[in-house]
Amino acid sequence: MSASAGNDARTKAAKQQQGAGAAERPATKGSATKPVEKRAPSRIHATWDGEQRFDAGRPGGKTLRLDGTGKTGQSPVDVLLSALAGCTGIDILEILAKRRTPVERLEIEVVGDRADVVPRRIIAIQLIYRIDGAGIERDQAERAIDLAVNKYCSVRESLATDIVISWSMTLNGEPYTPGGA
């Protein structure tokens, strides 16, 4: 079987599996997909080191140590949560920059709750943003986070639709939880 045929078969199987039981993520206000420039597929190469570790990265690029024990590198789940933090963080910075709102500091903590049964998948994620910037108003920060988490972050959009994702923030030292919770 050629690589192209294998990819076609995997794509077909994924579409069938999705239609067979996966719920479609409800569209958020303004989240209709619009055509974008076609990009090459993302490609990562992972090399096993003989233990419960892999070194993974773009071909010819820097690598990241994935460690099933968590002793010498991040676990695969840690990397997934890190990807969500990085993705939403980059989107937040871009959104605030477009509004000419300078950010002095952005820290993100991600807490992933896992199921008690194998495969111990993530069932809920809480994102905690700490943002500092003299000119940032609460509504600007809230809007940027909401857009990042619910519209623009491709990592978020790639997660299972039944994962509950919530967020809170501290803006210039003042805590805030959307909805007053």
Predicted regions located by residue number:
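Alpha-helical metal-binding/catalytic segments enriched in His/Glu/Asp
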Residues: 87-88
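Extended beta-strand/beta-hairpin segments
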Residues: 1-82, 92-181
